[in-house]
């Protein structure tokens, strides 16, 4: 009887120790105050664009929800009558450039061929809705881009703005 009481008390102590450790306030995952401010600035940019309305009172950006986050896009112009959209494996030839919300460029404008499955998830989901001849502005939040780790010159938590024209599906 005495042993079982000690066992129960030991078990309760272990559960409490694990519980207190799990409830720590270190939710910043080691990010600096400067990084957290950058993340928040990028999130605020997305929040503002989500509710932006055009002259007609309609939302300016279409929204694609993917994995609990939202990528935004709008068609800036269209040439031709093509209505077919690519599949996830369709090679898409486009002229593309990439910018941060500060207008600093991270991808110079150039022609490239990519598949929707071969790019960051947010851009891939938007490409599945595009047709040949469309000029598109896509806004990709960090969760649907490169995430919260630095990646080849792209700072952690960056919102990505891609502007591209679909030339052809190969």
Region spans (language model):
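Bacterial N-terminal signal peptides
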Residues: 9-19
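Cross-family detector of peptidyl-prolyl cis-trans isomerase
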Residues: 2-6, 19, 23-170
């Amino acid at each position: 009887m005495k042993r079982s009481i000690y066992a129960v008390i030991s078990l309760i102590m272990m559960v409490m120790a694990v519980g207190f450790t799990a409830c720590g306030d270190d939710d910043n995952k080691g990010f600096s105050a400067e990084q957290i401010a950058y993340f928040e600035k990028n999130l605020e940019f997305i929040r503002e664009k989500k509710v932006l309305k055009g002259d007609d009172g309609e939302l300016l950006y279409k929204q694609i929800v993917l994995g609990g986050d939202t990528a935004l896009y709008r068609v800036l112009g269209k040439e031709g009558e093509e209505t077919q959209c690519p599949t996830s494996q369709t090679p898409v030839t486009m002229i593309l450039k990439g910018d941060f919300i500060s207008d600093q460029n991270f991808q110079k404008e150039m022609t490239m061929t990519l598949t929707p499955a071969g790019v960051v998830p947010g851009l891939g989901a938007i490409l599945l809705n595009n047709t040949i001849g469309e000029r598109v502005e896509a806004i990709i939040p960090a969760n649907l881009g490169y995430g919260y780790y630095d990646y080849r010159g792209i700072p952690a938590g960056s919102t990505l703005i891609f502007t591209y024209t679909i030339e052809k599906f190969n």
